[in-house]
C-alpha cells in the first residue's frame, strides 16, 4: 500500500502515480482441499486468522482498509471466520509482512508490493509506477487484462496468493522542506520514496529512502529526510 507537490514544470513527474494496496494470503489456507469432514461439522468450525500490516494500527486511510476487510469477512461468514488485524510492529516489522505470510507464521497481510522489490522486483508494477495508469486503468488491466494472473504467478514461488485490496488513485508528488524550482534542487535531496519512483528520483540526482509510514512525520521534522511522498 501514498500523497505529494512539485512546482511546474516538474510537477507532473509523479502525476500518474497510483498505489495499489495488496492483501496477501498464505497459499493452502483457503480450505479448498477436501478434508473428509462432514459438511455440518465444517459449518460449525470456527476460523480465526491473523492479518499483519505495514501501517500503524487504525492509521487514517491505509490502516482502516484491513479493519473493513475483517468486519466484512466476519459479517459475510456469519461469525464463522474472524480476522484479527495487527498494526506495524505489533507482531512483525512494517516491512516484514511479506516474510510473515510467506513463512506461514501469519495467514494474511496488507501492504504494498514495492516494499518487496529485493525479493520480487516485478511486484513494483503492482504498486506505484511513475507515469503509469490511472486507478480505473489499473483495475482494467488487473481484472480484465491478465494483470492479476501475472501477479499471482510471480508470488506463487513464495507460497503467497495476492488479492487487490485498495487503490489510492492518481496522486501528487510530495511534501518538501524546501521549494523545488529546478532539477538542481533535487541533487542530493533525501526523499522517502520506494519502488520505481525511487529509481526515477535517483536518476535525477536525489537519494531515495524507504521508511514505514508511521515514521515519516518525525523523519521529516528531524531532518532525517528532506522530503516524503505518502497518501
Model regions and ranges:
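An acidic- and aromatic-residue-enriched active-site/binding cleft used to recognize and process polar
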Residues: 54, 88, 196, 213-214
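Short, low-complexity disordered leader/linker segments with a strong preference
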Residues: 1-48
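Contiguous mixed-secondary-structure segments that line small-molecule binding/active-site clefts
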Residues: 35-38, 70-74, 112-208, 213, ...
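Alpha-to-beta junction loops
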Residues: 79-81, 97-111, 192, 206-208, ...
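Extracytoplasmic "Venus flytrap"
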Residues: 50-67, 88-93
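Short, polar/charged alpha-helical segment
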Residues: 59-84, 199
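A structural preference for short, hydrophobic beta-strand core positions in alpha/beta folds
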Residues: 83-87, 210
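Short, hydrophobic alpha-helical packing/hinge segments within bilobed ligand-binding/sensory domains
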Residues: 94-98, 216-219
Amino acid at each position: 500500500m501514498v500523497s505529494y507537490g512539485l512546482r511546474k514544470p516538474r510537477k507532473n513527474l509523479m502525476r500518474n502515480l497510483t498505489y495499489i494496496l495488496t492483501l496477501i494470503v498464505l497459499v493452502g489456507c483457503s480450505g479448498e482441499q477436501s478434508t473428509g469432514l462432514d459438511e455440518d461439522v465444517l459449518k460449525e468450525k470456527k476460523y480465526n486468522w491473523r492479518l499483519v500490516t505495514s501501517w500503524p494500527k487504525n492509521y487514517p486511510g491505509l490502516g482502516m482498509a484491513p479493519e473493513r476487510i475483517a468486519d466484512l469477512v466476519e459479517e459475510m461468514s456469519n461469525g464463522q471466520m474472524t480476522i484479527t488485524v495487527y498494526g506495524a510492529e505489533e507482531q512483525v516489522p512494517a516491512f516484514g509482512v511479506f516474510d510473515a505470510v510467506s513463512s506461514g507464521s501469519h495467514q494474511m497481510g496488507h501492504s504494498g508490493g514495492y516494499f518487496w522489490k529485493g525479493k520480487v522486483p516485478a511486484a513494483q508494477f503492482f504498486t506505484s509506477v511513475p507515469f503509469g495508469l490511472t486507478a480505473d486503468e489499473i483495475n482494467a488491466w488487473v481484472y480484465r487484462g491478465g494483470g492479476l494472473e501475472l501477479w499471482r504467478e510471480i508470488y506463487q514461488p513464495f507460497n503467497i496468493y495476492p488479492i487487490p485490496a485498495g487503490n489510492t488513485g492518481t496522486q501528487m508528488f510530495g511534501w518538501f522542506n524546501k521549494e523545488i524550482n529546478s532539477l538542481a534542487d533535487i541533487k542530493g535531496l533525501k526523499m522517502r520514496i520506494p519502488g520505481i519512483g525511487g529509481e526515477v528520483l535517483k536518476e535525477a540526482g536525489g537519494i531515495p529512502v524507504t521508511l514505514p509510514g508511521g515514521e515519516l512525520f518525525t523523519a521529516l521534522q528531524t531532518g532525517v529526510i528532506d522530503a516524503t511522498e505518502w497518501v
